[in-house]
């Protein structure tokens, strides 16, 4: 989506969150509530866009989190 990759890592833990990567930049956002946890290289305008994308898709992302981690126990 807009060149951003949204992903989970197999060793991720709660709280429910998503990692975002584009080029050499990466960030981590918690899902409930959607909030920035870590940023390495994204500009503030990019972070606002990423946060808006996550807000719009938070239920879908959470569904995929639950499917991923419930299937990998």
Residues covered by each model-derived region:
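Multi-pass alpha-helical transmembrane bundles in non-GPCR membrane proteins
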Residues: 1-3, 24-26, 47-52
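A short, structured beta-strand/loop element
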Residues: 6-43
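C-terminal structural segments of small proteins and small subunits
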Residues: 44-73
């Amino acid at each position: 989506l807009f060149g951003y990759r949204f992903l989970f890592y197999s060793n991720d833990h709660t709280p429910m969150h998503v990692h975002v990567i584009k080029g050499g930049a990466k960030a981590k956002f918690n899902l409930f509530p959607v909030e920035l946890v870590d940023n390495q290289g994204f500009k503030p305008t990019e972070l606002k866009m990423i946060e808006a994308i996550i807000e719009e898709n938070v239920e879908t992302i959470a569904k995929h989190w639950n499917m991923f981690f419930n299937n990998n126990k």
